[in-house]
């Protein structure tokens, strides 16, 4: 007999339909799985065989052929255990599947219990788009799957409860759409940071325009503390943005079972020992890397010169294109990676170069060599470079309260609303992503501004890319100032954010 069971697969962060076809015929007992299965899918034969027997069903002593269609696409993971098991039971006549169009995903243990799998949300959204009426997933994935509104989602504990549901003896109840409750924790606040008003202003500009920023300063000056508070002034995520981020984290297996929706801008801070595939994504079965896990959020690289140069170079494509592409023999996958790059570093090996205390003992050659670990093309992609000096005693003991994140965030949201209206109907989300055409349209300069930019270009030896980034930052400063046109003071502030020299002089 022949049976077909609906299931789903993953390509990047998008799901697609997979049909599990099972054909049982007379002949020498054999169990073949075709349709480009990987090792985990092939091993499903033994898991399914044991689960069927341990759940009280009879495993067919026949020739069994399973095809995972489309046969030309590689199938990976353990999520096909459940549809394979149901296909065998249906083809052998031991179980009658529902007539309505349903999809099944889940790993099956040897005793017949269902275990969670990764990537459930993108597959659930695909199931809804394809036209499935019901989706059956392991219990631990049911809240995540319920985020796909418009399809009935059932959480299944084991094969026996699923069989009872099909027979009508004990129907399962569909899971209601999960809604987020109260936030689990407060984000770190800028009111905790003493002084450093210039750095705070630079981070406000960066947040308002989505600009990349580099913080340079001695140990203990507050670089990491400032960077970790950046998410607290970023605008709220839209529903579409939250779902997009959640899909990426679902594929990476990083979602909480109790709180499956990513509702805040991500903040990722990998260690400097991370490899290039760990940063960009990769593996034999590609998975998202840190640049994708930081999508719509912040990627913080502390101690920037300590990262391997080849690791940092993989940032160039996602910083320019907002997407990272991973090519393998089995195919190519792309992951979105539109993030704010926030970097922090010391000005030399000991960390005290240029400090008025005179504690630095590094030679000029040593300083230049240390700073030279960062390539020019990568620095060109950083919009704002700001110095974070060490604090003196009077600044540390200042009693005046610092401005809270909520106040800064209101200004950032106002600037982002201006940009949202400006770029409505285009793929651009913020000033940092302006195309050359949009720059000509929205970054027109008066003769006074042009003169100021000309002087900065000549004096600072700016590249064409650096010139464009100064203009983008100036446009953001104008938005924060509620100015429809870029003024000389906006240019002056934007140029100030490029004056710190990373050449050890």
Regions found by a protein language model. Give the residues of each.
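The Walker A (P-loop) glycine that initiates the GxxxxGKT/S ATP-binding motif of P-loop NTPases
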Residues: 217, 281, 303
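Hydrophobic anchor at the beta1->P-loop junction of P-loop NTPases
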Residues: 215, 301, 344
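Walker B catalytic acidic pair
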Residues: 296, 302-303, 314
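Short beta-strand elements
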Residues: 18-24, 279, 383-386
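Walker A/P-loop
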Residues: 215-256
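Peripheral, non-AAA+ core regions of ATP-driven protein-machinery
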Residues: 1-214, 218-224, 327, 466-467, ...
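Conserved alpha-helical scaffold flanking the Walker A/P-loop in AAA+ ATPase domains
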Residues: 204, 261, 266, 273-299, ...
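Basic, amphipathic alpha-helical bundle interface domains used for macromolecular binding and assembly
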Residues: 34-45, 58-60, 67-77, 286, ...
């Amino acid at each position: 007999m022949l049976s077909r069971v609906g299931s789903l697969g993953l390509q990047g962060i998008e799901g697609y339909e997979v049909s599990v076809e099972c054909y049982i015929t007379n002949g020498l007992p054999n169990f073949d799985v075709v349709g480009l299965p990987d090792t985990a899918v092939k091993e499903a034969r033994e898991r399914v065989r044991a689960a069927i027997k341990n759940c009280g069903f009879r495993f067919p002593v026949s020739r069994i052929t399973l095809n995972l269609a489309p046969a030309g696409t590689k199938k990976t993971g353990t999520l096909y255990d459940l549809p394979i098991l149901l296909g065998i039971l249906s083809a052998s006549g031991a179980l009658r599947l529902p007539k309505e169009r349903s999809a099944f995903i889940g790993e099956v243990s040897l005793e017949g219990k269902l275990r969670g799998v990764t990537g459930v949300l993108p597959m659930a959204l695909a199931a809804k788009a394809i036209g499935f009426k019901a989706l059956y997933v392991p219990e631990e994935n049911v809240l995540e799957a319920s985020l796909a509104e418009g399809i009935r989602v059932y959480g299944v504990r084991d094969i026996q409860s699923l069989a009872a549901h099909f027979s009508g003896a004990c129907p399962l109840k569909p899971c209601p759409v999960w809604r987020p409750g109260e936030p689990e924790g407060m984000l770190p606040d800028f009111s905790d940071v003493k002084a450093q008003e210039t750095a705070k202003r630079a981070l406000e500009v960066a947040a308002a325009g989505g600009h990349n920023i580099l913080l340079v300063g001695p140990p203990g000056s507050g670089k990491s503390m400032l960077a970790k508070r950046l998410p607290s002034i970023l605008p709220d995520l839209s529903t579409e943005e939250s779902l997009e981020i959640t899909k990426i984290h679902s594929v990476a297996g990083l979602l909480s079972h109790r709180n499956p929706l990513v509702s805040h801008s991500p903040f990722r801070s990998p260690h400097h020992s991370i490899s290039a595939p760990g940063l960009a994504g990769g593996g034999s079965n590609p998975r998202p890397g840190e640049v994708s896990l930081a999508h719509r959020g912040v990627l913080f690289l502390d101690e920037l010169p300590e990262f391997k140069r080849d690791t940092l170079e993989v940032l160039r494509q996602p910083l320019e294109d907002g997407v990272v592409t991973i090519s393998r023999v089995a195919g190519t996958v792309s992951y979105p990676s539109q993030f704010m790059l926030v970097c922090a570093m010391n000005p030399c090996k000991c960390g005290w170069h240029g400090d008025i205390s005179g504690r630095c003992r590094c030679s000029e050659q040593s300083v230049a060599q240390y700073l030279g670990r960062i390539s020019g093309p990568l620095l060109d992609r950083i919009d704002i470079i700001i110095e974070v000096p060490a604090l003196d005693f009077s600044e540390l003991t200042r009693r005046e309260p610092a401005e809270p994140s909520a106040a800064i965030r209101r200004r950032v949201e106002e600037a982002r609303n201006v940009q949202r209206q400006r770029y409505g109907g285009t793929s651009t989300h913020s000033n940092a992503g302006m195309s050359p055409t949009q720059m000509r349209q929205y970054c027109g300069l008066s003769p006074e501004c042009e003169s100021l930019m000309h002087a900065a270009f000549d004096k600072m030896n700016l590249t064409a890319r650096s010139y464009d980034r100064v203009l983008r930052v100036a446009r953001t400063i104008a938005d924060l100032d509620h100015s429809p046109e870029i003024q000389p003071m906006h240019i002056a502030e934007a140029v100030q954010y490029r004056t710190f020299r990373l050449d050890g002089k």
